[in-house]
Amino acid sequence: AQIGREMVLHTSHRYNWVQLAGAVNHPEKGKRIDLSSDNDKLADIDDSSVILYPTDGYGNPDLLKGIIEVEKPDAIFLITDPRYFQWVFQMENQIRKNIPIAYLNIWDSMPAPMYNKEFYESCDALFGISKQTKSINEIVLGDKADSKVIKYVPHGLNNKIFRPLDKTNEELQKFKKHLSRGKDCDFMLLFNSRNIRRKSISDTILAWKLFLDELTPEKREKCTLVLHTEPISDHGTDLGAVIEYFFPENDGNVVISADKFTTEQMNMMYNCADGVILISSAEGWGLALTESLLTGTPFIANVTGGMQDQMRFEDEDGNWINFDKDIPSNHRGTYTKHGKWVLPTFPTNLSLVGSPVTPYIYDDRCSFEDAALRIQEMYEMGDKERCERGKAGMEWALSDEAGFTSEKMSNRIIEGLDELFNTWVPREKFEFLKDTDYQSRVLKHKIIY
């Protein structure tokens, strides 16, 4: 939702938008809501057109057909997991005769998902949020990639909201006291994400314990791990029970923050932290790292998915790495030189897991022992070095190379859509297929790299 909002806001000077606004049970389902005047104020323009069609779930074919008939869009733009839009892809032979389909997509981990082939083939433009995803689109499509617009469009956030603050600011100091539950804190490490299994929160807690066990009681007392997440989740675990088990006399060393914060408060939270930690497995992007970068906060992260983009690993020529079928990911540590703002942990285990709809994907987990060493390294840096490293990360995130801001992300979207409109050829009304045309869904890249 955050990315979609920023994209619409920063492209509404160029395109009119009609959005299927989904929710589990949307209270305004069936309405047509005009947000143009509100968007004009936020975007500082006077001619935008932003229309919402609230709906339950992700929409349905009848609703989309009605919107196409009434609003007459020039393209359809999709964002999210392809399985939520199977019903759109099943209509592609009707839609693409008249208008193209663009898809801002991401895939969390290797191997390249050949089971997504039909989804990718149903699109005219594929904007990969991570470098790994762009490579996956090309690997899965094979020769058919030549007929698509395929671009790298990393996530970007509003750098007027997520920005460094004066650490001596009285309001910020009060907020830090709130986060630490009134405790004096010399070192605060922040986790900010959902309580789901692949976020490895329990491993983070265990790494924190190993780190604290090496400190004197006096130093330990002034260290706090803030977990900004749900305390209990069926998709994750009971964090209170985990904390009680490893910290039976918890004196504020681990704090769960379940408050709902405004974006300004979220920015303050990152500015309170000395570092951010996110050691997820199979992480598509990791917005917590983007927020960390824009606030000038160094981070500890697992080398996986889109998180490795935000670490700026370099190849042999000093260039920001790209991926292909020979080196489809850096989670094996092929490249080790990275930006100074990150302390990476490399996966120590790549386990092939899956489900009926996603038969194979790597669960690439780092060890909590490695994470503990990275925490200790960040702690021993001291405030000055952490600030210098965080500043370097912020400057890179704002640069044209990275461009992890709303404006630069939106400019990349505009470039991609303009290319699509200039090159798009409508789908043939019909095509002949032979029963021998089926291609087996087989491995197309190296396993060891």
Briefly describe each language-model feature range.
Residues S281:
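Aromatic "clamp/platform" in nucleotide-sugar-dependent glycosyltransferases that forms part
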Residues P298-A301, M311-R312, G318-K325, L343:
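Short hydrophobic beta-strand element within catalytic cores of glycosyltransferases
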Residues A1-S36, E71, I447-Y449:
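N-terminal subdomain of nucleotide-sugar transferases
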Residues A23, Q132, G156:
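Carbohydrate-associated surface elements
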Residues T336-Y449:
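C-terminal amphipathic helix plus adjacent low-complexity
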